UniProtKB/Swiss-Prot annotation:
Upper taxonomic lineage: Archaea, Thermoproteota, Thermoprotei, Thermoproteales, Thermoproteaceae
UniProt GO molecular function: DNA-directed RNA polymerase activity; metal ion binding; poly(A) binding
Protein name: DNA primase DnaG
Keyword terms, alphabetized: DNA replication, DNA-directed RNA polymerase, Exosome, Magnesium, Metal-binding, Nucleotidyltransferase, Primosome, Transcription, Transferase
Residue ranges constituting the Toprim domain according to the UniProt record: 172-248
Ranges for region Disordered: 279-303
Subunit composition and interactions: Forms a ternary complex with MCM helicase and DNA. Component of the archaeal exosome complex.
Amino acid sequence: MGALTIVAKYMIVAQIEVNGSVDKSDIIGALFSQTEGLLGKDMDLRELQMMGRIGRIEVDIFEKNGKTKAKIYIPSNLDRYETALVAALVESIERVGPYPASVKVIEIRDLREEKRKKIIEKAKELVKLIEEEILPDTKEIIERLKEDVAKAEVVEYGPERLPAGPDVDKSDAIIIVEGRADVVNLVKHGYRNVIALEGISRGVPQTIIDLSKKKNVTVFIDGDKGGELVLKELLKVAHVDYIARAPPGKEVEQLTAKEIAKALRNKISLEEWLAQQKASGERAEAPPQPAQQPQQEQPAPQRPIQAPFDLEKKIEEMLGTLEAEIYDQNWTLVKRLPVRELPDFLATSGDSIYAIILDGITTQRIVDLAAKKGVKVIITARTGPLTKVPEDMSIYTFEQLKKTE
């Protein structure tokens, strides 16, 4: 069993049987894709993982006679009712890739049992202490507890000693906020994978830049002009996946638990944010290349793409849709989907992919995922900062193709 990624209350242990040969990523992909939306956004596995309410899903897999069996481990920081719902949700999986599958929850372990025993023993000692010692003032105790909890929960992260929640390293996704007060508020309401910029007057901390390269990043900004300025500075040097915003006129540190949850549920992708900026009449530019990494320029197309349809008409059809189309080697349409779902599709799909046309921004993350799938052609509205493009992959912008028609 793999290491836990959160301080969990429960461990869901399930067994899956697949009538075919699959790997771990196929099983995990099926868990996310087939349960999405079944119980609403509050119980969506991706949302729960982003908030640190469930941990990294681990799979122990073994194959025999062309069939695959595996054990699935899901650490949960939810209450027992919500944990039971997640377990039942997992049992709803019916396929992995093209193969029929069945899932059975074996057990739900209470990981806090040992801790309870220790607490009871300690409580017995403290009862004796209370009887023997004069109790201090109640208000003083409460103030001490508040101070100790605050100090224990918010840690200093990286060489810049940035304020952060305790689960930044453990979680696959992080929430970036502006200041320490924002971190304290989010940690207080259960979001432990949060870290602060601590202002941008001296530039974006290198720790934030490094974290953005290896984790899924949501930037949570204040609902004022200052929040937008912070975001634009961050986009110059860091990779951002999603943007969440406090209600107009409010700061993140002022939000209630309900307001925080709503803002994070309503987060949008970077591509959607740029499209909104453009639609509202603001000049929205793609994030420029970080200074420490020279940007690789895309050459203009040297030869026309041999597609069996009019590319210029296709581009006109795609403009404004914020969607992507996936094609195989014969330029047969495999799938059409929102651009925000493209990274997950590339990471989990078993389809053969030759070309992608998308009304959005092609980021380095999309290029990396596409390269793993053997994609040869990407036609995109715009490109973000690209530092590494495979030699056998061609990337064309809509403008480039219009010029060559």
